[in-house]
Amino acid sequence: MSYRIRLFAKDCVACNACYEACIDQNDIDVLKGDEPFRTGLEYEPRSMVKAATSACLHCSQAACIEVCPHGCLYRDEVTGFVVYDDTVCIGCGECAKVCPVDAIHFRADGRIGKCDGCNERVKNAMLPACVQCCPTGCLRLEEV
């Protein structure tokens, strides 16, 4: 069984609850410059705001997995999410270059950071933190 987190942007009210949940769940140190992996906001001309996501789409043909020279990125056999082992990441950035949605970031220590779909939560029959806290339901965990 494979999953994905889907964003229904029209339902987003830009409350940033998902952003905060991602920071909390992943112990992201924004003061050091580390970035959350979840939805953020983009601003369009004339002050229009739209929801945008920097979260991994967990592509079925994930180029990031293929280009990683140390096997840092791999697909979880249970959830189907593209996950990583940051202890083997050398920070070369090859994965980020091929990501079609700019979902791969590098932490202040130079190692990879990306949405892993809250993989361990999903394995334990829980929703990803961003999905669980979303007050409008614009983020949903779906089977694919």
Model-derived features with residue positions:
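Non-ligating segments of multi-cofactor redox enzymes
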Residues: 1-144
